[in-house]
Swiss-Prot record:
UniProt organism field: Streptococcus suis (strain 05ZYH33)
Protein name: S-adenosylmethionine synthase
Cofactor note: Binds 2 divalent ions per subunit. Binds 1 potassium ion per subunit.
Alphabetical list of Gene3D superfamilies matching this protein: 3.30.300.10
Annotated K(+) binding sites: 44
Gene Ontology cellular-component annotations: cytoplasm
Length: 396
């Protein structure tokens, strides 16, 4: 019998406590960038019953009404009723934002290449906002070149939110989680969905039988292609039996606690840095986007079926200290050729990434729920496939 393997990824809805925090942090970032594209922002958020704390470091000429941004974000998510234990108008908002450390700022505003080597290249001016390593990934399992388990997991919780916000399923509340287990064949191709887990917050009067029927028929079967489902697929719908208390009333939330949900669902390695609330001088964010951009174009060019790109930086230095590409034995050319082509085509200095992907714009709040990578519902610059021909030519 051929060997088959299972892989599982999860996602969470926009109403999950950690995702509320991410969205608030990115809403603040967007509000600042709309007035001051050169701002340096590191905005962290903590949420719990009846309270939001916003803290971190910001250098900007902009004035932003933090209180209003927080409340508008919470209302947009759907926390508008007192019985949720967390509502837009009654929540306490406690901002505590300070100026960015001058020790960090001197390395970001004037990179080592400019200070030490007197470089005149304007793209050498910005140094990395911190040391670190970042990964980007792509695989040919889905049209958006993402792993199937995380792709399906995101789409399931997005569908729940659509049904809730449209009023089609009126008993749904904002907090929800999904988890999808996919079975792979001996060639590492996805063949079926083995297990689907969905937990969704709900009003107290609805029966679990009704929730199960609605979730299977109106969420799972509308999102997961029928050829992946069979009579052996397991469905766990609200397996605790009740999920009325949710959101920040049920659990506290913090910015940056869903980094695997934000990326590839554990299918690829992760450098550990979170995204939300950070401007593009923070390579945790911008270099992760650049690495995804590279990996996606490599796979789209047919140069590999699967590609993982690692970038690494030193704080205050513009050029990356390393670039590595791993195609897991699927490349059609030597990986050394791919690395040389990537270094030639993509400017991986922070200022180069910012320019290449136009990252000084207020585009970040929309990424703070349902994944930063592989999005088909919004237009993100790191998802473009405009380097395919350049890569094909460069490896000849």
């Amino acid at each position: 019998m051929s060997e088959r393997k299972l892989f599982t990824s999860e996602s969470v809805s926009e109403g999950h406590p950690d995702k509320i925090a991410d969205q608030i942090s990115d809403a603040i970032l967007d509000a600042i960038l709309a007035e001051d594209p050169d701002a340096h922002v590191a905005a962290e958020t903590a949420v719990y019953t009846g309270s939001v704390h916003v803290f971190g470091e910001i250098s900007t000429t902009a004035y932003v009404d933090i209180n209003r941004v927080v409340r508008d974000t919470i209302a947009e998510i759907g926390y508008t009723k007192g019985e949720y234990g967390f509502s837009a108008e009654s929540v306490g908002v406690h901002p505590s934002l300070v100026e960015q450390s001058p020790d960090i700022a001197q390395g970001v505003n004037e990179a080592l290449e400019t200070r030490q080597d007197a470089s005149q290249d304007p793209l050498d001016l910005i140094g990395a906002g911190d040391q670190g390593l970042m990964f980007g990934f792509a695989v040919d399992e889905t049209p958006e070149l993402m792993p199937l388990p995380i792709s399906l997991s995101h789409k399931l919780v997005r569908r729940l939110a659509e049904l809730r916000k449209s009023g089609e399923i009126a008993y749904l509340r904002p907090d929800a989680k999904s988890q999808v287990t996919v079975e792979y064949d001996e060639d590492n191709q996805p063949v079926r969905v083995d297990t689907v887990v969905i937990s969704t917050q709900h009003d107290p009067e609805v029966s679990q039988e009704q929730i199960r029927q609605d979730v299977i028929e109106r969420v799972i079967k509308e999102i997961i292609p029928a050829h992946y489902l069979d009579d052996q697929t397991n469905y766990f719908i609200n397996p605790t039996g009740r999920f009325v208390i949710g959101g920040p009333q049920g659990d506290s939330g913090l910015t940056g606690r869903k980094i695997i949900v934000d990326t590839y669902g554990g299918y690829s390695r992760h450098g550990g840095g979170a995204f939300s609330g950070k401007d593009a001088t923070k390579v945790d964010r911008s270099a992760s986007y650049a690495a995804r951009y590279i990996a996606k174009n490599i796979v789209a060019a047919g140069l590999a079926k699967k590609a993982e790109v690692q970038l690494a930086y030193a704080i205050g230095v513009a050029h990356p200290v390393s670039v590595r590409i791993d195609t897991f034995g699927t490349s059609t050319v030597a990986e050394s050729k791919l690395e040389a082509a990537v270094r030639h085509i993509f400017d991986l200095r922070p200022a180069g990434i910012i320019q290449m992907l136009d990252l000084k714009r207020p585009i970040y709040k929309q990424t703070a729920a349902y994944g930063h990578m592989g999005r088909t519902d919004i237009d993100l610059p790191w998802e473009k496939l405009d380097k395919v021909e350049a890569l094909k030519t460069a490896v000849l």
